[in-house]
Amino acid sequence: MSGSVEFRLRTTRKLERRDITEEVAKAAAKLGVASGALLVSLPHTTAAVTVGEAWDADVTSDIERALAAWVPGVRFDHAEGNSPAHFLSEAIGVSCLVPLEKGKLVLGRWQGVFLIELDGPRERHVQVRALKTEN
């Protein structure tokens, strides 16, 4: 089977790095694709998704601090005040590919899939689409 699955989550902070590896793996199981890749994407302009370090919790706090400091002195014209979130979303990206083999995510030993909230707290939708390999 191929297709797509969507799951939702509620972020709790303005800037938050959330490990969604388990939810993406569950989506892969629902999709029933043994080999190929998953396109993990967000229909949002103030959040991002990426693959990164999942083992050491200090990396999450380091990344959150670095993102908060990345654009503090830049003057933005957008009146809502969330232009830094839009910029960071575009810089990080709103989609990533995760290889699948034998129905399992193919990630490095320390890797995980992360949603990066940049303008929370909010409810976020994560779309997972199967891209299967032809046999």
Residue spans of the language-model regions?
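Active-site histidine-anchored catalytic micro-motif
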Residues: 1-135
